[in-house]
Amino acid sequence: MVKSYRGVAQAKSPKVVIQDVSVADYMTRRLITFDPDQTMEQVIKTLLDKKIAGGQVIDTRGELCGIISEGDCLKEVVKGKYTNTPSLSGKVSDYMSTNVQTVNPEMNIFEVAQMFLNMKLRRFPVLKDGKLVGQISQKDV
């Protein structure tokens, strides 16, 4: 008769189930938005006062039409220095990014995390039925 020894019995670890965590659970709902006709001077002042890096641009119908960022503002500042015009008179619509990647509040947070890695973006506007309802950033995830 041969007896075999398999070592000390190990307790099986319970299976971990990742719950369906949505963007709505982590997104920011209180947003600072801008108007396409605002001056870049107003935007820069708001970004500095609120200590934010950018914001969504909403048209008169309340629909997302772009995003304005620190980088977009820098373009206006550099243009003013180059042409020796101290006024930041350009409009948001002249500098905003209009090709905006968005997500919806029901999306899985892990899917959005992968989008952050793949697209090299820092934030996504969250739209529900075509309306801006929030923003999800890398810091939120």
Question: Which ranges hold each PLM region?
Answer:
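Tandem CBS (Cystathionine beta-synthase) repeat/Bateman regulatory domains
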Residues: 1-141
